[in-house]
């Protein structure tokens, strides 16, 4: 019985190393590919600001409701590189979005 177990193992240690390396690479690749999907399958804005001064905003990204999140999300990229979630129902945020949309149409 011990002999049967030994004969089932590969006799070439180099082949075993290559097979293990390939297995690790495949597992790491699947995990990395799944990581980005997992973050996209939920709302990005857990807390929102009621407003922010427009001079601090570099760009605004409005995400419509979808299978990943049931609410509209407004994500402002600030001039300092940070991102801030804004409340889409806030009158100030609505004006900021309108201003950004109008400036995009005029360019």
From Swiss-Prot:
GO BP annotations, alphabetical order: actin cytoskeleton organization; chemotaxis; G protein-coupled receptor signaling pathway; immune response; inflammatory response; intracellular signal transduction; negative regulation of cell population proliferation; nervous system development
Pfam families (UniProt xref): IL8
A GO term from the CC aspect: tertiary granule lumen
Cystine crosslinks: 43-69, 45-85
Matching InterPro entries: Chemokine_b/g/d, Chemokine_CXC, Chemokine_CXC_CS, Chemokine_IL8-like_dom, CXC_Chemokine_domain, Interleukin_8-like_sf
Record-stated family: Belongs to the intercrine alpha (chemokine CxC) family.
Protein name, as recorded: Growth-regulated alpha protein
Lineage: Eukaryota, Metazoa, Chordata, Craniata, Vertebrata
